[in-house]
């Protein structure tokens, strides 16, 4: 009897294992059968969910880009169909002195607004991230210019730049200095626009830096204090390197904004005097809707798109892999 019980137990175990194996094989076979019997719409359903967004993206992004590139190879005639001219519009663009002037203006505008607004945003974020009295009010004051429409910002700054009656000339008058036409002088108009855009954009970029600073573990600063590191050394060696991904994101947004902001030109200067304040996008607007030269405007648009694509490639293809920390 002592040897019979283990034998019976073993046979029962082997029998149960065989049953489990058969059940598993039957279950797998059932899954394969159900997978083969799965209706076609189950595979198509995810694509149907993506279809509305894909249609909108193709209609309002991809098609306009292709249509713009296509239009650059033609010229329109008043009483006839469009005439194919090949690369003539591109040759005319490179021979156009106004194009080179507005491109230079845009470069000066970008170099003036991008680094200054980023540096100011970083300083403001570090300041409002500390424990100080009225911190909420200070944050609101820094961010308020961002929520104002560009048209409103332009009108506010016209109050500063108006000759003789503006705030700047009123302050100059206190020192016996004559009035100055800030927006009518080729040497000062671009600087005036740069200051205004920095005032508007710095608060927007500050939000990203503030969010990044609040995500940094406080143990880093405590460890640096224990080691005797000063605030400047801690910022240069720890804080700023950890903020580089945020700086890259803010930088690419600043580059895009430097080429797409033209609302203030319509209100303040209309590109003058003598195209001294005209930017590339505003020149495209003038060519398309004032001079009614749509093919040449399309050619300028392709050039603007190419500049932004190069900036994006530098960002995603080169800088991303060198400054992100895992």
Task: Give, region by region, the residue ranges found by the protein language model.
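A structural signal for multi-pass alpha-helical bundles of membrane permease subunits
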Residues: 42-326
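Transmembrane alpha-helical segments of polytopic membrane transport and secretion proteins
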Residues: 1-13, 19-50, 132-135, 314-326
């Amino acid at each position: 009897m002592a040897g019979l019980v283990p034998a019976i137990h073993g046979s029962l175990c082997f029998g149960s294992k065989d049953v489990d194996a058969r059940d598993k094989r039957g279950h797998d076979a059932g899954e394969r059968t159900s997978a083969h019997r799965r209706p076609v719409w189950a595979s198509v359903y995810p694509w149907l969910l993506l279809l509305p967004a894909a249609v909108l993206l193709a209609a309002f992004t991809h098609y306009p880009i292709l249509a713009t590139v296509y239009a650059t190879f033609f010229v329109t005639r008043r009483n006839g169909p469009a005439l194919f001219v090949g690369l003539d519009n591109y040759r005319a663009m490179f021979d156009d002195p106004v194009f080179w002037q507005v491109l230079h203006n845009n470069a000066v505008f970008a170099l003036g607004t991008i680094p200054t607004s980023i540096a100011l945003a970083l300083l403001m974020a570090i300041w409002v991230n500390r424990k100080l009295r009225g911190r909420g009010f200070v944050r609101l004051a820094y961010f308020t210019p961002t929520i104002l429409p560009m048209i409103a910002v332009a009108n506010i700054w016209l109050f500063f730049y108006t000759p003789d009656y503006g705030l700047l000339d009123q302050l100059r008058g206190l020192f016996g200095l004559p009035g100055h036409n800030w927006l009518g002088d080729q040497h000062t108009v671009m600087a005036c626009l740069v200051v205004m855009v920095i005032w508007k954009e710095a608060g927007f970029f500050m939000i990203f830096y503030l969010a990044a600073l609040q995500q940094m573990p406080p143990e880093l600063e405590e460890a640096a204090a224990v080691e005797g590191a000063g605030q400047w050394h801690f910022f240069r060696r720890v804080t700023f390197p950890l903020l580089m991904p945020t700086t890259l994101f803010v930088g690419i947004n600043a580059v895009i904004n430097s080429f797409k902001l033209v609302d203030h030109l319509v209100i303040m200067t209309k590109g003058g005097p003598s195209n001294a304040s005209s930017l590339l996008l505003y020149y495209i607007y003038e060519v398309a809707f004032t001079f009614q030269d749509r093919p040449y405007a399309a050619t300028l648009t392709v050039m603007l798109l190419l500049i932004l694509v190069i900036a994006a490639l530098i960002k995603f293809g080169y800088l991303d892999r060198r400054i992100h920390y895992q």
